[in-house]
Amino acid sequence: MVVTAIRQTSSDRLIVTLDEAEEIKTTLGVVTEHRLYNGAELDDAAAEALRRDSARALARDRALGMVSRRMYSRKELRDKLVQKGEDADTAAYCADWLAEHGFINDETYAAAIVRHYAAKNLGVSRIRMELSRRGISRELWEYALAEMPENDSALERYLRQHLPDPFDLAAVRKVSAALYRRGYSWDDIRTAVEQYSKQYEDF
């Protein structure tokens, strides 16, 4: 195959034409790395490497734009890239490259998720669900959850905000159900309500 044209479309984007037929969208970095020029001859392996490296470079730039706007886990990033039309191998390459260069970090992301949902007074089981949904590996869960504030203080805070009368049984049932949906165990909820009620009795 012969490079019959190299056309620049933006500061870092080019289109390389092979045999006056196949157009490959690529980047300046790839063109430089492959030392392409008009008239350059490529064997099948070199042409395939050009296609692969071009797809990876464009997908990598797309991924960098994505992680500049919000945090992603490796799995989230892979899945999102596939949704946007990248093939699975290219998406996996991008996630690995970004992780290797420090642009994504599942451990840091897990800790951020725990802090975010703990601040919303969510319990451990609900936070575990959020970690799982985002594709965070289980081995990172416990490390991140170890940084979570104690349940007691979060539960007490929630009860103060939502249960003005701890002796109103209907209100207690409603608040208890809400806390269970937030990921707290029934044992933790019952203990917290009892302690909260005792404060009123002592008063």
Give the residues covered by each predicted segment.
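An alpha-helical, amphipathic repeat domain used for nucleic-acid recognition
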Residues: 1-203
